[in-house]
C-alpha cells in the first residue's frame, strides 16, 4: 500500500471572490483536507474552545513564539495577532492530511520564505489563488452584498487589486466566474497535487 505525507495548501483570494464557499465544498468532497489550528492573542468568543478553534495566547506568549521562530507565518489584524505554528502543520502533514491555510498574500510570502529554509515545507507547500474573472465582476459581487458604503467598497477594491497583483507568488489560479465550475476545478486541482510523487513515503515497490 502506498503511504503519503500531506500537502500544505496555501489558499488566498480577495474578499468577495467566493474563497470560503469553495474551500467548504472541497472539504465536503475530500475528507483528508484539514484546517490547522491558529494561534491568536484575542480573547475567546462564546463557545470557542482552546486548542480546537484557536490556541489562545497572551501577547507575551505569542511574542515568545515569534522570537523562538515557531511560526510559519504570523500577522497583526487590528489590535490582535494571529499565527500558524510549524509544529501544528508538520504533525498533520506527517499523518497524511492535506492542511489548508486560508491566508493573505503577506502570509503566503512568509510561507515561501519558510519553504526556502525548510525542505519539508518546500516539498509540501502548494500555493493557490482564487481570483475573479475581472475587477468589474468582483465590484458587482461586493456591491451586491449591500454591506458596503461607497467609501468602504472603494477601499476593498483597492485592497483586492493590490492582492491580485501578487498572483505570481502562487502556483495555481482558480478563476471563480461560475461557482459550480470553480468548485470542480479546485477539487480536481487538490486531487492532482495529492498524487504528486513527492508525497509518497519511502519505496513502496522495493
What do these predicted ranges mean?
Residues 55-57, 83, 102, 173:
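Short aromatic/basic micro-patch
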Residues 6, 31, 121-126, 168-170:
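Short glycine-/polar-rich loops that comprise or flank the Walker A/P-loop
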Residues 13, 18:
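Conserved glycine(s) of the Walker
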Residues 63, 67-70, 84-146, 190:
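ATP-dependent NMP and nucleoside kinases share a basic, alpha-helical "lid"
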Residues 21-70:
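N-terminal phosphate/diphosphate-binding loop that engages ATP/GTP or pyrophosphate donors
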Residues 1-8:
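Extreme N-terminal, non-catalytic leader segments
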Residues 2, 140, 147-148, 162-206:
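NTP-dependent small-molecule kinase module
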Residues 72-79, 145-151:
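Flexible beta-alpha connector loops of hexameric P-loop NTPases
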Amino acid at each position: 500500500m502506498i503511504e503519503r505525507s500531506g500537502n500544505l495548501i496555501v489558499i488566498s483570494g480577495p474578499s468577495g471572490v467566493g474563497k470560503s464557499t469553495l474551500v467548504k465544498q472541497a472539504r465536503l468532497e475530500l475528507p483528508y483536507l484539514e484546517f490547522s489550528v491558529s494561534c491568536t492573542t484575542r480573547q475567546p468568543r462564546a463557545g470557542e474552545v482552546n486548542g480546537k478553534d484557536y490556541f489562545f495566547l497572551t501577547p507575551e506568549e505569542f511574542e515568545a513564539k515569534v522570537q523562538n521562530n515557531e511560526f510559519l507565518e504570523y500577522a497583526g489584524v487590528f489590535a490582535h495577532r494571529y499565527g500558524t505554528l510549524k509544529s501544528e502543520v508538520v504533525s498533520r502533514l506527517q499523518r497524511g492530511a492535506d492542511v489548508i491555510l486560508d491566508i493573505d498574500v503577506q502570509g503566503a510570502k512568509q510561507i515561501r520564505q519558510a519553504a526556502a529554509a525548510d525542505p519539508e515545507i518546500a516539498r509540501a507547500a502548494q500555493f493557490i489563488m482564487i481570483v475573479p474573472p475581472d475587477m468589474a465582476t468582483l465590484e458587482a459581487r461586493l456591491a451586491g452584498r449591500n454591506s458596503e458604503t461607497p467609501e468602504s467598497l472603494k477601499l476593498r477594491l483597492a485592497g483586492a487589486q493590490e492582492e491580485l497583483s501578487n498572483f505570481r507568488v502562487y502556483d495555481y489560479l482558480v478563476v471563480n466566474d461560475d461557482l459550480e465550475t470553480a468548485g470542480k476545478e479546485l477539487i480536481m486541482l487538490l486531487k492532482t497535487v495529492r498524487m504528486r510523487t513527492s508525497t509518497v513515503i519511502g519505496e513502496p515497490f522495493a
